[in-house]
Design a protein with these regions (language model features):
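Membrane-interface helix-loop junctions and terminal tails of multi-pass membrane proteins
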Residues: 1-243
């Protein structure tokens, strides 16, 4: 159990180092990749998640919503549900702190130069028009999560013991969902990806912080992925007949 928890923590932290790190690269003043755009960021997220699976194995979830889905289909015991979720959330927080420390000089150089909201969005997902149409944003995030988790569970069923194939498939799934559906909410699909770094942004010594938008964070990336995950698990198990 301890080894599994450490793998969840380590894989999630590494994922967030890749993810928050690439947003630091594209947003902050003085980085070599400033202004590289969303295509660059989404591709890095995708490859980074594949790397995490290469290192820690295909059994890691790195995502409380995925933990819930795997509990529903019987891949993860219900007794492991809360511990795995907590390990993922802690990994998300620590990974964001590591990324901030790596880019601390660039954060300092960006003070008064880079928009505070853009700096906040390095850490967390936020909608295109902030604070409006929560129902639409919730629906979009739930649909993204449904497609994301359904595809991963189906790929895992078909890949069997081939962890390398599964890792590549997951990266492609992240890339496709991000490019095709992520432009509205930023496609969190994962509380550890959003709320973990959002908590880190709350406590890190970054000057001129924007409002952390907790109302949106707790409702949309906080709850919607669980809804999408449950529907995905029922679809994969009940309709596709897997697991």
């Amino acid at each position: 159990m301890l080894t599994k928890l450490l793998c969840e923590f380590g894989a999630t932290a590494l994922m967030i180092v890749f993810g928050v790190g690439v947003h630091c690269d594209t947003v902050l003043k003085g980085t070599k990749y400033q202004g590289s755009g969303h295509m660059f960021a989404i591709t890095t997220w995708s490859f980074g998640i594949s790397v995490c699976l290469f290192v820690f194995g295909g059994a890691v979830c790195m995502n409380p919503a995925m933990v819930l889905a795997q509990c529903v289909v019987g891949l993860v015991p219900w007794g492991n549900c809360i511990p795995f979720m907590l390990a993922d959330m802690l990994g998300g927080f620590v990974g964001a702190v590591i990324a901030w420390f790596m880019y601390a000089d660039e954060f300092k150089a960006s003070e008064g130069v880079v928009d505070p909201i853009a700096q906040r969005n390095i850490f967390s997902t936020n909608p295109t028009t902030e604070g409006t149409n929560y129902a639409r944003n919730f629906f979009c995030e739930a649909i993204c999560t449904f497609v994301f988790i359904s595809a991963i569970l189906a790929a895992a069923s078909r890949a069997g013991e081939n962890v390398l194939m599964l890792a590549i498939c997951v990266g492609l799934i992240v890339w496709a969902v991000g490019m095709g559906m992520g432009g509205i909410t930023g496609f969190a699909m994962n509380q550890a990806r959003d709320l973990g770094p959002r908590m880190a942004y709350q406590v890190l010594p970054i000057k001129n912080k924007a409002d952390n938008n907790w109302k949106y964070g707790l409702l949309v990336p906080g709850i919607a992925p669980f809804v999408g995950a449950i529907v995905a698990a029922l679809f994969v198990h009940g309709f596709l007949g897997m697991f």
